């Protein structure tokens, strides 16, 4: 059993993009920014506990940070982890429904 304290730290924020909204409409999949060390089991448990929905599948990927310049200084943005969480049939979770 994963501790509740850890579950609250796993999910960072919803990832809002055109691709994410299309995935929600067509495949009932939400896209989340998650902790870089989070496992698929932790992500599934956190979504189930916090949003009270049934999770069907979790797919993850690490987004590599881009190299950025500010004048002569060269820096790099941090890598971050993204999770595609597919919900079971009949389950619904809408982050941006009221943002019109």
UniProtKB/Swiss-Prot annotation:
SUPFAM superfamilies: Ribosomal proteins S24e, L23 and L15e (SSF54189). Keywords: Ribonucleoprotein, Ribosomal protein, RNA-binding, rRNA-binding. Coiled coil: none annotated. GO terms for molecular function: rRNA binding; structural constituent of ribosome. InterPro entries: Nucleotide-bd_a/b_plait_sf, Ribosomal_uL23-like, Ribosomal_uL23/eL15/eS24_sf, Ribosomal_uL23_CS. GO terms for biological process: translation. It comes from the Bacteria. One of its GO terms (cellular component) is ribosome. Belongs to the universal ribosomal protein uL23 family. NCBIfam families: PRK05738.1-1 (NF004358), PRK05738.1-3 (NF004359), PRK05738.2-4 (NF004363), PRK05738.3-2 (NF004366). PANTHER family: 60S RIBOSOMAL PROTEIN L23A. Part of the 50S ribosomal subunit. Contacts protein L29, and trigger factor when it is bound to the ribosome. One of the early assembly proteins it binds 23S rRNA. One of the proteins that surrounds the polypeptide exit tunnel on the outside of the ribosome. Forms the main docking site for trigger factor binding to the ribosome. This is Large ribosomal subunit protein uL23. It comes from Sodalis glossinidius (strain morsitans). The lineage of its organism: Bacteria, Pseudomonadati, Pseudomonadota, Gammaproteobacteria, Enterobacterales.
